[in-house]
UniProtKB/Swiss-Prot annotation:
Functional summary from the UniProt entry: Bifunctional enzyme with both catalase and broad-spectrum peroxidase activity.
Gene from which the chain derives: katG1
Keyword Transport: no
Lineage: Bacteria, Pseudomonadati, Pseudomonadota, Betaproteobacteria, Burkholderiales
Protein name (record): Catalase-peroxidase 1
Catalytic residues (UniProt): H92
Taxonomic source organism: Burkholderia ambifaria (strain MC40-6)
Length: 728
């Protein structure tokens, strides 16, 4: 008999066989319940924005300046300056951002958590964050890790003689990992072409991914799958940087500007490097990549396996990157770790050693650096920057600011004394309120005008939903403020039914103009406000039809953006490929429609009950795209009833698929065989999925109609105001 002590607890944090193990295709609702108050250690009344406003930013920057040149024996600074390390840390914090779904980025300080803290591309950034801990400890809750990581990158640049474009705080920390799809691969840095490859066809990268391999931020610096071909690498660079909202000029500026500083590390073989932080022993205290190669640090450090220093002044802003790029011819070589890199042919040794002042080296470059010379489009930009240093400096400053602030959303979220005054197109600018706002009496009068305009409840509700539901909690873009639903590209999106939308907007514009023309004190209502107000009027009427008196909350203050304030290409990524709330799929996808619904709900920051009540309410209000009848489980559309749930849960109905793709279903009366309803996967999932069915049963109960209406109104109001950072 074994004498090994057996733990009496089998259901501990150490894990066990999970539901996901048993049913790997089960719909995952966990993403709707991340970052709740249960994981947040701060007091309930803690307001990070107010805490940051009390911060002495200048004092923090002085401490960071001192840190830059205070080398620590446990992780010595290259060239006696941590600037290059901290630039990389900030870049990699922000650089996970991707435009397709707005996820990733610096907000929340996710670099502290798995998987990002253990990505191969983030090797030894754990040391950078530990170097920062005394400063974070000193200022505590007044500066988040998320803000500190980016501020440190800015100070690093400034300490090396570069003038940055500005800095904004306002990134509140999160306290657990995001649940983000980073790819299907099961092996770090797995090459393309495998069974879980993110590439298909002619090297077409899977959406929404924005990196070429699992565990990389953007591209493989050795070239595609390690092939040292600068021209082929340029294609990867262009694709991945575009997916992070950067054009060619911004891309060249970022690569050249970032690689003006510091060095890469590849002193020895990767086999000497220990496990990443999440796999390291508990005694490592959250650090990883412990190296057995010589001292394992400083001159002996191994990070990427590459051993490259780009400029002769790696701790000072200079023009050396382009000077070296164009002044030399380059020959392929290998680092001490065996990685492909390039060395200047026949060049003098002008590059300082990071730890031995008596040594010099020839200039070296990465394959992806040479892309800036050998790709024709990049070469033109690089030559222009080479010949115009001031233009290059300005381009890098602006691109760095964009990189580090892209996921913050509108300027209303920016905090601190270093926020640049210039308004930038990628910030989706909206005019500031310049007139008196409507009051409660005006709201009541406008609701009456809207209801008397001839527009139906379905038209009012679907238009307001279309306007507000573009919001993404990931990068804080979209939403009803700005009324961009009336502008390109949103007015032409298929999901918005352009012809029908134009008619609704024309009617609402007539109501708006009549109201504004009648005012004598300069009071106005914006179309952005009126669209939301009209939706509220429609819901109140629909609730009244159900016998429930309710007032939908409304806060004026939205403004109307202009077409000139709207970047059409940047706005295009907000177009829904699916909106289960409106029973819409743009085309067939490998991902099930119900998973796309949950993804949309997560971007709208909704939880399970909010998702459930909104779908049920929008169905009976007739908000489906194209007036489709799928999921309209009621004989009284336009009435805010709980009929969707009552009829879905009715055991007198038997459901069967009627499409080859199993995406459309008929519900027939079990007794007569007659078709009662039709529905899609996003309808039937509320009866099929055990958690969603439990929620549906709450709203389908005999005593639930009033609760359903009030919960629907609360969830609706939340969506309508997701972008109202001015109300915070």
């Amino acid at each position: 008999m074994s004498t090994e002590s057996k733990c009496p607890f089998n259901h501990t944090a150490a894990g066990g066989t999970s539901n996901k193990d048993w049913w790997p295709n089960q719909l995952n609702l966990n993403i709707l319940h991340r970052h709740s108050a249960l994981s947040d250690p701060m007091d309930k009344d803690f307001d990070y924005a107010q805490a940051f406003k009390k911060l002495d930013l200048a004092a923090v920057k002085r401490d960071l300046q001192a840190l830059m040149t205070t080398s620590q024996d446990w992780w010595p600074a290259d060239f006696g300056h941590y600037g290059g390390l901290f630039v990389r840390m900030a870049w990699h914090s922000a650089g996970t951002y991707r435009t397709a779904d707005g996820r990733g980025g610096a907000g929340g300080g996710q670099q502290r958590f798995a998987p990002l803290n253990s990505w191969p591309d983030n090797a030894n950034l754990d040391k950078a964050r530990r170097l920062l801990w005394p400063i974070k400890q000193k200022y505590g809750r007044n500066i988040s890790w998320a803000d500190l990581l980016i501020l440190t990158g800015n100070v690093a640049l400034e300490s090396m003689g570069f003038k940055t474009f500005g800095y904004a705080g306002g990134r509140a920390d999160t306290w657990e990992p995001d649940d983000v799809y980073w790819g299907s691969e099961k092996i770090w840095l797995e090459l393309s072409g495998g069974p879980n490859s993110r590439y298909s066809g002619d090297r077409e990268l899977e959406n929404p991914l924005a990196a070429v391999q699992m565990g990389l931020i953007y591209v493989n610096p050795e070239g595609p799958d390690g092939n040292p071909d600068p021209v082929a690498a340029a294609r990867d660079i262009r694709d991945t940087f575009a997916r992070m909202a950067m054009n060619d000029e911004e891309t060249v500026a970022l690569i050249a500007g970032g690689h003006t500083f510091g060095k890469t590390h590849g002193a020895g073989p990767a086999t000497d490097v220990g496990p990443e932080p999440e796999a390291a022993g508990i005694e490592q205290q959250g650090l990883g990549w412990k190296s057995a190669y010589a001292s394992g640090k400083g001159h002996d450090a191994i990070t990427s396996g590459l051993e490259v220093t780009w400029t002769s002044t790696p701790t000072k802003w200079s023009h050396d990157f382009f000077k070296h790029l164009f002044s030399y011819e380059w020959e392929l070589t290998k680092s001490p770790a065996g990685a492909h890199q390039w060395v200047a042919k026949g060049a003098d040794e002008v590059i300082p050693d990071a730890f031995d002042a008596s040594k010099k080296h020839r200039p070296t470059m990465l394959t992806t650096d040479l892309s800036l010379r050998f790709d024709p489009a990049y070469e033109k930009i690089s030559r222009r920057f080479y010949e115009n240093p001031a233009e290059f400096a300005d381009a890098f400053a602006r691109a760095w600011f964009k990189l580090t602030h892209r996921d913050m959303g509108p300027r209303a979220r920016y905090l601190g004394p270093e926020v640049p005054a210039e308004e930038l197109l990628w910030q989706d600018p909206i005019p500031v309120v310049d007139h008196p706002l409507i009051d409660d009496a005006d709201v009541a009068a406008l609701k009456a005008k809207v209801l008397a305009s001839g527009l139906s409840v379905a038209q009012l509700v679907s238009t307001a939903w279309a306007s507000a539901s573009t919001f993404r909690g990931s990068d804080k873009r979209g939403g009803a403020n700005g009324a961009r639903i009336r502008l390109a590209p949103q007015k032409d999106w298929e999901v918005n039914q352009p012809a029908a939308l134009a008619a609704v907007l024309e009617t609402l514009e007539g109501v708006r103009k009549a109201f504004n023309d009648a005012q004598t004190g300069g009071k106005k209502v914006s179309l952005a406000d009126l669209i939301v107000l009209a939706g509220a009027a429609g819901i109140e009427q629909a609730a009244k039809n159900a016998g429930v008196a309710v007032t939908v909350p409304f806060a004026p203050g939205r403004m109307d953006a202009s077409q000139e304030q709207t970047d059409v290409d940047a706005m295009a990524v907000l177009e829904p490929v699916a909106d289960g709330f409106r029973n819409y799929l743009k085309s067939a996808y490998k991902t099930p429609a119900e998973a796309l619904l949950v993804d949309k709900a997560q971007l709208l920051t909704l939880n399970g009950p909010e998702l459930t009540v909104l779908v049920g309410g929008l169905r009976v209000l007739g908000a489906n795209v194209g007036d489709a009848k799928h999921g309209v489980f009621t004989d009284r559309p336009g009435t805010l009833s709980n009929d969707f749930f009552v009829n879905l849960l009715d055991m007198g109905t038997e459901w069967k698929p009627v499409s080859a793709a199993n995406d459309v279903f008929e519900g027939r009366d079990r007794a007569t065989g007659l078709v009662k309803w039709t529905g899609t996967r996003v309808d039937l999932i509320f009866g099929s999925h055990s958690q969603l069915r439990a929620l549906a049963e709450v709203y389908g109960s005999a005593d639930a109609n009033e609760k359903f209406v009030r919960d629907f109104v609360a969830a609706w109001d939340k969506v309508m105001n997701l972008d109202r950072f001015d109300l915070a």
